[in-house]
Amino acid sequence: MTIIRKSHPLMKMVNHAFIDLPAPSNISSWWNFGSLLGLCLIIQIASGLFLAMHYTSDTTSAFSSVAHICRDVNYGWLIRYIHANGASLFFICLYLHIGRGIYYGSYMYKETWNIGIVLLFLTMATAFMGYVLPWGQMSFWGATVITNLLSAIPYVGTSLVEWIWGGFSVDKATLTRFFAFHFILPFIIAATAMVHLLFLHETGSNNPLGIPSNSDKIPFHPYYTFKDLLGVIIILSLFLTFVLFFPDLLGDPDNYSQANPLNTPPHIKPEWYFLFAYAILRSIPNKLGGVIALVLSILVLALFPLLHTANQRSMMFRPISQLLFWALVSDLMILTWIGGQPVEPPFIIIGQIASILYFSIILLLLPIAGLIENKILKW
């Protein structure tokens, strides 16, 4: 008799995706982040569901309902902090996952890569709308500033902003619709992640060498299930330490004050995971130009497959590209720091230089480095 996991229609799908999946024998721990992102999504959906049971999306009671969750609901404080810091964990894993893809040339699987970019946009939209829900000062003003950026779109901008707001300012209608979208988007993300996996399993995983691994495959279970499990244990240990000991470290103190349209916070800034894009937005003194740069800072990822000039896929044996890659990582860290600083010298010029460098490395220097390395290696 055939084993049920190989014959049952549903089990067969799971089997082909997670058990008998042929995987390269040499993939490193950098390949753990896909499964960790799945874990993050499950944590966020589960904790979010319990928060939604007690949250009210009304401007008069949203802030109080979050306080009620923390004070009166059994382990409400824990669920709230797991959800808030879970977003940070999600983005840490997401950025490391993208960095791995760039370093090892995984972007050459174009369909998987492009679906990944769609996933990044969806996750960013979800996180932004979630940040508005507690209805603190930074929630309100962050929502006002970021949605207002759409008014830079010629001709339809103002109408578009008022349509999103559901009125002439961020108010009850905005909060209600943001809650609705924040609730539904994670399920859309989960469905899109399935498509991401579908495309990945069409080609099979890349590996650190960037060469075909068809001649040397091993089953996903037990090898990579246990390897992933180690990553899960390490990440969860660090995450719970963070949640239980430093729950407010990454939050903004302004968000503990209720939203007040008559009082603007001294420095309006988003959560840390958006600061690099926020710095790029602020480095251009023109509103429309800033918005275009903001969108391009993420969309530029779609150009990686087109700008790949090297004859080797991975950066593992390409020292010039490696140097540029780590320069890009450092540049993103500088942009993140600048995004959290006030708009005054010397931060303005540092942000502008870092923004130019960000686009230069991706659009110009990495493709040139690839060509130089081809020459050096006489490939």
Swiss-Prot record:
Heme 1 (or BL or b562) is low-potential and absorbs at about 562 nm, and heme 2 (or BH or b566) is high-potential and absorbs at about 566 nm. Its cofactor is heme b. The keyword Electron transport applies. Heme b b566 binds at H97, H196. Signal peptide: none annotated. The cytochrome bc1 complex contains 11 subunits: 3 respiratory subunits (MT-CYB, CYC1 and UQCRFS1), 2 core proteins (UQCRC1 and UQCRC2) and 6 low-molecular weight proteins (UQCRH/QCR6, UQCRB/QCR7, UQCRQ/QCR8, UQCR10/QCR9, UQCR11/QCR10 and a cleavage product of UQCRFS1). This cytochrome bc1 complex then forms a dimer. Gene3D superfamilies: Cytochrome Bc1 Complex, Chain C. Heme b b562 binds at H83, H182. Keywords: Electron transport, Heme, Iron, Membrane, Metal-binding, Mitochondrion, Mitochondrion inner membrane, Respiratory chain, Transmembrane, Transmembrane helix, Transport, Ubiquinone. It is a multi-pass membrane protein. GO terms for molecular function: metal ion binding; ubiquinol-cytochrome-c reductase activity. One of its GO terms (cellular component) is mitochondrial inner membrane. Binds 2 heme b groups non-covalently. It is found in: Mitochondrion inner membrane. Belongs to the cytochrome b family. It comes from Chaetodipus artus (Narrow-skulled pocket mouse). A ubiquinone binds at H201. Component of the ubiquinol-cytochrome c reductase complex (complex III or cytochrome b-c1 complex) that is part of the mitochondrial respiratory chain. The b-c1 complex mediates electron transfer from ubiquinol to cytochrome c. Contributes to the generation of a proton gradient across the mitochondrial membrane that is then used for ATP synthesis. The chain crosses the membrane at residues 33-53, 77-98, 113-133, 178-198, 226-246, 288-308, 320-340, 347-367. This is Cytochrome b.
